[in-house]
């Protein structure tokens, strides 16, 4: 009987521990939302940590990389921002905001020709989206 009680207590504690660790376990999308909120409130270091956590949870989280690129620009880490925005574009070449942000990063770096090419890609993609949206309006 004592062994059964001991096993039951051990099992209960183990189960509670597993449940509690899952309660504090955020998914990648939640980290991105957290990063956005931190950014809105001007807590850029916390935002960066949240975006990095999102990417760690899901290395294919496009919005995690996009947010991280924005933070890197604010920190004047333009090479890192460029890499982050290029990661977004590699995963989704139609992400027009990433093309714009990459152009902005290039402009900050003094790479005018690269900036203009990125802005042109942004304009083409945005124009296509606007055209599609206008056709869908009744």
Write out the residue ranges for each language-model feature.
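C-terminal motif of bacterial Sec signal peptides marking the signal peptidase cleavage site
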Residues: 19-22
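Bacterial N-terminal signal peptides that target proteins for export
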Residues: 2-11
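Alpha-helical segment of the N-proximal tetratricopeptide repeat
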Residues: 26-57
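Canonical tetratricopeptide repeat
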Residues: 33, 67, 101, 135-136
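Structural signature of tandem alpha-helical TPR/SEL1-like repeats
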Residues: 41-53, 75-87, 109-126
């Amino acid at each position: 009987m004592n062994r059964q009680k001991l096993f039951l207590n051990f099992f209960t504690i183990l189960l509670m521990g597993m449940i509690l660790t899952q309660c504090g376990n955020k998914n990648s999308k939640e980290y991105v939302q957290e990063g956005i909120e931190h950014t809105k409130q001007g807590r850029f270091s916390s935002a960066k940590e949240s975006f990095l956590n999102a990417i760690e949870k899901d290395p294919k989280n496009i919005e995690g990389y996009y947010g991280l690129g924005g933070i890197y620009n604010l920190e004047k880490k333009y090479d890192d921002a460029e890499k982050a925005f290029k990661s977004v574009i590699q995963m989704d070449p139609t992400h027009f905001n990433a093309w714009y942000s990459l152009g902005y990063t290039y402009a900050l770096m003094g790479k005018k020709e690269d900036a203009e090419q990125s802005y042109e890609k942004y304009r083409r993609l945005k124009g296509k989206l606007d055209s599609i949206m206008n056709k869908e309006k009744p």
